[in-house]
Amino acid sequence: MVKKAKWLKNVKKAFSPDSKKLKHESVECQDSVISYPVLIATSRSSSPQFEVRVDEVNYEQKKNLYPPSSDSVTATVAHVLVDSPPSSPESVHQAIVVNRFAGKSKEEAAAILIQSTFRGHLARRESQVMRGQERLKLLMEGSVVQRQAAITLKCMQTLSRVQSQIRSRRIRMSEENQARHKQLLQKHAKELGGLKNGGNWNYSNQSKEQVEAGMLHKYEATMRRERALAYAFTHQQNLKSFSKTANPMFMDPSNPTWGWSWLERWMAGRPWESSEKEQNTTNNDNSSVKNSTNRNSQGGETAKSSNRNKLNSSTKPNTPSASSTATRNPRKKRPIPSSIKSKSSDDEAKSSERNRRPSIARPSVSDDETLSSSTARRSSNLIPTTKSARGKPKSQTSSRVAVTTSTTEESSILPEKAPAKKRLSTSASPAPKPRRSSAPPKVEKGVLKAERTP
């Protein structure tokens, strides 16, 4: 700070005039120029001794075209002072000093003096300016000024560099924001166009984020469900041993759960379709159950009605017909040999093994109908034998033989027809139903009472 203050003082001194010197200098005589206060001093007392002959001075000046020199002026002044008698100091101050402007008027002398003083002032000022320029030149060529100039230039360069970087960054950010805004607008327009064209417009009051969160939650739930099902299925498969089928399905032998996992994944990926299909399947199952129950009821009713008709026909008092049937077949039927029976049983076992399926299923409605019809036939064949046995004890042996032959024939015929009916029932029945026990009605007591009454 001290050096800076000194430097500023030096600069100010270089450009400021010397006012102090002008104040202290009262009278200066440079280049034979008399100052203004000396010329203004005039004597109030005009004495004839000190009168100056103006005509003579003018005449001399006219002769000499150039103005008188300083030596002549000083000589004249000294001559006048020598010639004058001694007097008081007041009279000395009032003495008129003869100068070179003696032959001119006062106005002309004043104008000349003013011009000379003004020219001297201009010359002094020019010299001061020249001195100040030299001092300034010396200061500018110094090391301090050079150091300060280098520092200022570096600061200006850094400021300009920072400003240029800030401007370029602002321009780049504005361009990036514009490009991003355009991309968002294009994406939004594409989404709207796709939704309008697809017709999958969502009219819910939820926001896009909420809808996406719900879809993600559903997807995670389906994936969890699929994993749980796969885990349970693998454990069930490890616990159970499935029998190999004759015609295996098309699947990967290394991965036994190939078809199941693919189907489950496909169904889990479409929850709305799976819900609709489940509803349809439940409706179909309900309708099939209703149809099966109706068929069961109809089959049971028909079986019951047929059994009742047969029982009524058998309970009627037709003793001569029974006796005639017993007398018509007096011949004894030959019993079937054991070899034929064994062959028929082997054939039946082979046919049943061929037609047997690996799937475990319960007998359906047709099986119940076959069982009911077979029991009804057996009961109808047994009832007349009891009547004839009680009516005619002599023909007991023949009736027993007939009954045994008829039962063996029926037993040999029924197993051959049963597998075909079972195959039809398993293919026609939609789902396994519980077994319906169809036993023949107990009619022995009623028959005995009807026989006793007549």
UniProtKB/Swiss-Prot annotation:
Transmembrane segments: none annotated. SMART domains: IQ. GO terms for molecular function: calmodulin binding; microtubule binding. Residues 103-113 are annotated as: Calmodulin-binding. Keywords: Calmodulin-binding, Cytoplasm, Cytoskeleton, Nucleus. Induction: By mechanical stimuli and aphid infestation, but not by jasmonate, salicylic acid, 1-aminocyclopropane-1-carboxylate (ACC) ou auxin (IAA). Residues 280-328, 371-388 have a biased composition (Polar residues). Residues 107-136 form the IQ domain. It is found in: Nucleus; Nucleus, Nucleolus; Cytoplasm, Cytoskeleton. Residues 272-454 are annotated as: Disordered. One of its GO terms (cellular component) is nucleolus. Residues 343-356, 442-454 have a biased composition (Basic and acidic residues). Residues 397-412 have a biased composition (Low complexity). The keyword Nucleus applies. May be involved in cooperative interactions with calmodulins or calmodulin-like proteins. Modulates expression of glucosinolate pathway genes. May associate with nucleic acids and regulate gene expression at the transcriptional or post-transcriptional level. Recruits KLCR1 and calmodulin proteins to microtubules, thus being a potential scaffold in cellular signaling and trafficking. Binds to multiple calmodulin (CaM) in the presence of Ca(2+)(e.g. CaM1 and CaM2) and CaM-like (e.g. CML8 and CML9) proteins. Interacts with KLCR1. This is Protein IQ-DOMAIN 1. It comes from Arabidopsis thaliana (Mouse-ear cress). The gene is IQD1.
